[in-house]
UniProtKB/Swiss-Prot annotation:
This is Phosphatidylinositol-binding clathrin assembly protein. InterPro entries: ANTH_dom, ANTH_dom_sf, AP180-like, ENTH, ENTH_VHS. SUPFAM superfamilies: ENTH/VHS domain (SSF48464), GAT-like domain (SSF89009). Residues 221-294 are annotated as: Interaction with PIMREG. One of its GO terms (cellular component) is clathrin-coated vesicle. The gene is Picalm. One of its GO terms (biological process) is regulation of vesicle size.
Length: 660
């Protein structure tokens, strides 16, 4: 038989379906393959015994179930697996086996399938008997003799007389069961029995070491014992001498099958004079006549016997010391490898973090090192040159925050880098800042009053500061109009001259689009006169003047002719401002714009110009007819369509409108 049988595969598949990994591993460890259980399966089962959530009785029952198989291979491998777990597994496993009344009932096992089955069945019966005795020994003394502490302060050397006389016979029974295996080197012909013999060999070495230490302790206390205790002790010692001979034969078989000679201990026989001294002492206690012997001679004989047995014990423990040393070296090698791996990981982590942290610093290091120190609390400097940052990020050889605008004038003289933000001339500084945002201009009066006359003109001025370059106090705060509101309402109403001056240094939001044509700087531009029938012209101011005139607000009077009753039919006689009467479709709801309340009015039906005025930029309402416009929040998107400015001279909110 070689390899796993079909029955083994079916059984393993059944356990896979049921989800029992332990039973599946037991099945794989005890297949029909003529070889010892595989190490990977044994290691897995050992680990299972160390897990608290593994059912130890279920594991043991699985092994017991495999011993009921008719094949000697399966039964033998089941016993080997059980023995391996008893020696190397968790102590819970052997505790459970010791608590059972019966373990392996294989005293009548016989495999009649072949000649090899007959031969192996004999060793199976002997092997099962030893495992049963091993479990019984654990039940009696509550510890495993192969795992007890050995040496001068070991368990067997420090045991008292009463307990010692009860414990040593238990060791003798277990040793007898082990030596009853009685295998020859010629019978170790397959891997299964070889695996069992190796486990028995290790148990024999450890068990005899404990046995030897118990005998040493017994001899040291023999001459102080009572008569009954001396009689029991003498009988134990005689059995010990007999078993030493059998143990020597067992070790010879181990040497013949190829076990290293260094792993086999040397057994030193005690002198024969010791047995005579023990018998004479017992006879003296019983009152028999013995030959004269001094206490000094007895002590000398006893010391010689103890030293010889102690040397035997040292030779027996030599294997364990080598195993211990090998285990320690292996653990040290693993620990060293783990330390090296950990040091490599720690060496990589700081390097990565430092590189990551240093990247932005190294990128901007040049700018940080070359940037001049700026004192924001310094007083304005009287230097005649403008401060310029030497670090040009884009190599454009210009100030870093220099605004890119058309016709930008130079910065004024006498200005520091940032100026004094806490100076007393904040108002003048605010007026001197270029108006880049139409909603950030300073209010010069009451917002509810009519628009001042000086708002209509664009004063000719040169900006005293550029954006983020510096703030210098201006001696005179000149009121100016917003750069975004380029509509001249006063000139349309006829209250002021139409001469305007274009600010060449201001910010051009629309790039010169929809602005009045300028002949030259500081040169007034008269408003072109258009025929009455042409509402829209190429000039923005003229177009607005015509549109406002058509709305009927050019005369500056307020229409208060509100009627609460149904008006009668009126005949229109015409006039310069006559328009066809068209019923209003809807009225705009009163809205608040910049804190100012304007009354309602209904826009008449008229032709809108192709381009919307740029005056009310930010109130983005598309021109639509027959619907109520929605008032939105002011924005800075200059490309949005704009709303016409409301009529500040319209009727009061809520009043009915009647057009003449």
């Amino acid at each position: 038989m070689s390899g796993q049988s079909l029955t083994d595969r079916i059984t393993a598949a059944q356990h896979s379906v049921t989800g029992s990994a332990v039973s599946k591993t037991v099945c794989k460890a005890t297949t029909h393959e003529i070889m010892g259980p595989k190490k990977k399966h044994l290691d897995y089962l050992i680990q299972c015994t160390n897990e608290m959530n593994v059912n130890i009785p279920q594991l043991a029952d699985s092994l017991f179930e495999r011993t009921t198989n008719s094949s000697w291979v399966v039964v033998f491998k089941s016993l080997i697996t059980t023995h391996h777990l008893m020696v190397y597994g968790n102590e819970r496993f052997i505790q459970y086996l010791a608590s059972r009344n019966t373990l392996f009932n294989l005293s009548n096992f016989l495999d009649k399938s072949g000649l090899q089955g007959y031969d192996m069945s004999t060793f199976i019966r002997r092997y099962s008997r030893y495992l049963n005795e091993k479990a019984v020994s654990y039940r009696q003394v509550a510890f495993d003799f192969t795992k007890v502490k050995r040496g001068a302060d070991g368990v067997m050397r420090t045991m008292n007389t009463e307990k010692l006389l009860k414990t040593v016979p238990i060791i003798q029974n277990q040793m007898d069961a082990l030596l009853d295996f009685n295998v020859n080197s010629n019978e170790l012909t397959n891997g299964v029995i070889n695996a069992a013999f190796m486990l028995l060999f290790k148990d024999a070495i450890r068990l005899f070491a404990a046995y030897n230490e118990g005998i040493i302790n017994l001899l040291e206390k023999y001459f102080d014992m009572k008569k009954n205790q001396c009689k029991e002790g003498l009988d134990i010692y005689k059995k010990f001498l007999t078993r030493m001979t059998r143990i020597s034969e067992f070790l010879k078989v181990a040497e013949q099958v190829g076990i290293d000679r260094g792993d086999i201990p040397d057994l030193s026989q005690a002198p024969s004079s010791l047995l005579d001294a023990l018998e004479q002492h017992l006879a003296s206690l019983e009152g028999k006549k013995i030959k004269d012997s001094t206490a000094a001679s007895r002590a000398t004989t006893l010391s010689n016997a103890v030293s010889s047995l102690a040397s035997t014990g040292l030779s027996l423990t030599k294997v364990d010391e080598r195993e211990k040393q090998a285990a320690l070296e292996e653990e040290q090698a693993r620990l060293k490898a783990l330390k090296e791996q950990r040091l490599k990981e720690l060496a990589k982590k700081p390097h990565t973090s430092l590189t990551t942290a240093a990247s932005p610093v190294s990128t901007s290091a040049g700018g940080i090192m070359t940037a001049p120190a700026i004192d924001i609390f310094s007083t304005p400097s009287s230097s005649n040159s403008t401060s310029k940052l030497p670090n040009d990020l884009l190599d454009l050889q210009q100030p870093t925050f220099h605004p890119s605008v058309h016709a930008m004038s130079a910065a004024p003289q006498g200005a520091s880098t940032w100026g004094d933000p806490f100076s007393a001339t904040l108002d003048a500084v605010e007026d001197a800042i270029p108006s880049l945002n139409p909603f950030l201009t300073k209010s010069s009066g009451d917002v509810h009053l009519p628009i001042a006359s000086d708002v209509s003109t664009f004063t000719t001025r040169t900006p005293t500061h550029e954006m983020f370059v510096g703030f210098s106090p201006s001696p005179v705060a000149q009121p100016h109009s917003s750069a975004g509101l380029n509509v001249d309402f006063e000139s349309v109403f006829g209250n002021k001259s139409t001469n305007v001056a274009v600010d060449s240094g201001g910010f051009d939001e629309l790039g010169g689009l929809l602005k009045p044509t300028v002949a030259s700087q500081n040169q007034s531009l008269p408003v072109a006169k258009l025929p009455p029938n042409k509402l829209v012209s190429d000039d923005l101011d003229s177009s607005l003047a015509n549109l406002v005139g058509n709305l009927g607000i050019g005369n500056g009077t307020t229409k208060n002719d509100v009627s609460w009753s149904q008006p009668g039919e009126k005949k229109l006689t015409g006039g310069s401002n006559w328009q066809p009467k068209v019923a209003p479709t809807t009225a705009w709801s009163a809205a608040t714009m910049n804190g100012m309340h304007f009354p309602q009015y209904a826009p008449p039906v008229m032709a809108y110009p192709a381009t919307t005025p740029t005056g009310m930029i930010g109130y983005g309402i598309p021109p639509q007819m027959g619907s109520v416009p929605v008032m939105t929040q002011p924005t800075l998107i200059y490309s949005q369509p704009v709303m016409r400015p409301p009529n500040p001279f319209g009727p009061v909110s809520g009043a009915q409108i009647q057009f003449m």
